[in-house]
């Protein structure tokens, strides 16, 4: 991928435009996909940090596991807690009381903030600077919109005018943290769309990294939906939330549910982990189990979710599943799963 980065902006644009047709993607999406992949490669090859990172979330489902056909605009990466000094006896779970456990989680958050905004930011800036062209315009900085101060933004060197496909932000969001559980994981490869189309134009078209298993991600998604079902009606639903229902639909539709549902111990581990590290007074993670798991949205959220799903149409490749079809499959799966 590094040879491609050395091409001029105009040369890269020709490749991006030549890739856009078959997948029904705009060239600017192809461009962003390349920079998402390249940023991942650089991040996981940082000498001090790479071995302590794991890739997870929606982008892993599209780029690594090929389960969803939705363009993801961010990178979700977790840092191993033990690397930050919170392993073994210092694990938050090992705290003698709930108060001590929460104190350790806050200390972990502070350590993670310092590492991301300090050494990791500096190292990634140096790595990017050593690879991109000297005449390319780019920046890497902390995301001021993240109240947790654990997100970086890479404003990549674009080959297109800013007024084209304005809905596509010319930045890769790198969402990080250290609260996630890294088990189970596997090593997988990913490839930019432009390299899939023009493999001979890349000396290194793909890259390997550690990624959270797809079954773990299945249960992570399920518990996200479970918590949403129990969200109080007076609390606003997060923006772009319909994507989680769409992703879960695809995980069921593509057969991941079959391998995940025989691993109920993994569901229990996810629920227990979230009850500590993502504590909520209303999420009812204790009920995220066979017989009481809820992945269907509550009735009063359907209208907003339908509208949100419609707004996200441009982020899908090809024809996305209809909202009613998503809801029908989730309803069927929930009913069958909860039969005891």
What is each of the regions a protein language model found here?
Residues 55-59:
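Glycine-rich beta-strand-to-loop/alpha-helix junction loops that act as flexible
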Residues 62:
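Betabetaalpha-Me/HNH-type nuclease active-site subdomain
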Residues 1-53, 65-69, 75, 81-340:
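Structured mid-to-C-terminal alpha-helical surface segments
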């Amino acid at each position: 991928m590094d040879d491609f980065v050395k091409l001029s902006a105009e040369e890269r644009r020709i490749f991006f435009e030549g890739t856009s047709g078959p997948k029904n993607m705009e060239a600017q999406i192809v461009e962003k996909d390349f920079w998402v992949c390249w940023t991942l490669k650089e991040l996981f090859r940082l000498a001090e940090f790479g071995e302590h990172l794991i890739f997870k979330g929606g982008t892993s489902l599209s780029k690594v596991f090929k389960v969803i056909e939705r363009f993801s605009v961010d990178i979700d990466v977790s840092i191993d807690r033990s690397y930050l000094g919170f392993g073994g006896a210092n694990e938050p779970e090992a705290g003698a009381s709930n108060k001590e456990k929460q104190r350790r989680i806050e200390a972990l958050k502070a350590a993670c903030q310092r590492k991301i905004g300090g050494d990791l930011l500096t190292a990634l800036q140096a790595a990017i600077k050593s690879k991109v062209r000297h005449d390319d315009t780019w920046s890497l900085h902390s995301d001021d919109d993240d109240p947790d101060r654990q997100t970086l933004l890479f404003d990549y060197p674009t080959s297109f005018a800013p007024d084209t496909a304005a809905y596509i932000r010319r930045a890769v969001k790198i969402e990080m943290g250290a609260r996630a559980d890294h088990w189970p994981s596997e090593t997988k490869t990913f490839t930019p769309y432009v390299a899939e189309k023009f493999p001979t134009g890349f000396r290194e078209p793909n890259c390997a990294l550690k990624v959270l298993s797809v079954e773990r991600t299945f249960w992570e998604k399920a518990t996200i939906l479970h918590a949403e079902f129990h969200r109080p009606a007076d609390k606003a639903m997060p923006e772009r939330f319909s994507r989680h229902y769409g992703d879960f639909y695809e995980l069921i539709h593509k057969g991941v549910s079959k391998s995940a549902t025989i691993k109920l111990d993994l569901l229990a581990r996810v629920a227990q982990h979230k009850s500590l590290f993502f504590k909520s007074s209303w999420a009812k993670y204790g009920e995220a189990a066979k017989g009481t798991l809820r992945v269907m949205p509550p009735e009063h959220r359907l209208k907003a979710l339908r509208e949100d799903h419609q707004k996200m149409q441009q982020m899908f490749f090809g024809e996305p599943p209809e909202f009613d079809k998503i809801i029908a499959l989730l309803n069927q799966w929930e009913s069958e799963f909860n039969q005891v």
